[in-house]
């Protein structure tokens, strides 16, 4: 994960796993709360996923590969 440039996060069935993911990537999007909002926005539709582009500075978050919903600590929805 340290060398990852792109991350795809599917819906998590286990709350502890989601908390670990938030702990790992939350700071890239300001706070863990911001990251959880991004995750929840991405999971609204069935079979959706959260895509994180970590190559950019600041990092960007997308619903699938289609709609940008976050850039650094800014939420875009």
Predicted region positions:
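Conserved ATP-driven motor cores of ASCE-family P-loop NTPases powering translocation/secretion/packaging/pilus
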Residues: 1-58
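Conserved P-loop NTPase motor module
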Residues: 46-77
